[in-house]
């Protein structure tokens, strides 16, 4: 995705409308902000923004109103979109392109989508829309057909763990490799969730290893989850209920325990069907 967008910016062939789709925390909004800086950068480098010119700095700190981020979840009415449309016809004051980043665009009402469609059909040369959504099926086909679509996939646990270790080093957080590995699995492909979990664990203080993560987040851990799975597989209802009660009495998050159980089942199935592959 980034290579394609870089090439478009470098060659001056950007679209007037983009649609970024994918699960939460995969970088859609972050990428949209970088793209907004790149198309307005005064000294771009192979499609990347320099992040030092007045345009890049102004967009980053939010002082340039020509680049606006709108949360459709709280601004989903037709009046807000019409106001945006009326403003969009004017040339930008400080940058080359006026960019509107509309997050959670699927939350717009039907009249709001219709109002948005009108400007997507005949956009001014100076205008760019970047729409982001976690629920693509809720976006009307008329909107989809007028956007370049990019699908953001879940980030691999290895990449999340590497990023968490980097951030921990920058923030002087004592994060161990096993702690980063566990956090990366709990993040479920969303780097933002991984960073939030790291902050939560670091707030407790001390070394953030796998044991500290389990304690801070109220998780059962591999051993207790495996024991629960053994009771289930052996059809020992009493043992399973006693194990669950023990976890509950130990202030473990039952919902999280069920999530761990689901992950364990997935890993077991993967090992059974593809023993040479990785889970």
Regions found by a protein language model. Name each.
Residues 1-149:
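P-loop/Walker A NTP-binding region and its immediately flanking N-terminal helices
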Residues 54, 58-65, 80-83, 96, ...:
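Extended, largely alpha-helical regulatory/partner-binding modules appended to the mid-to-C-terminal parts
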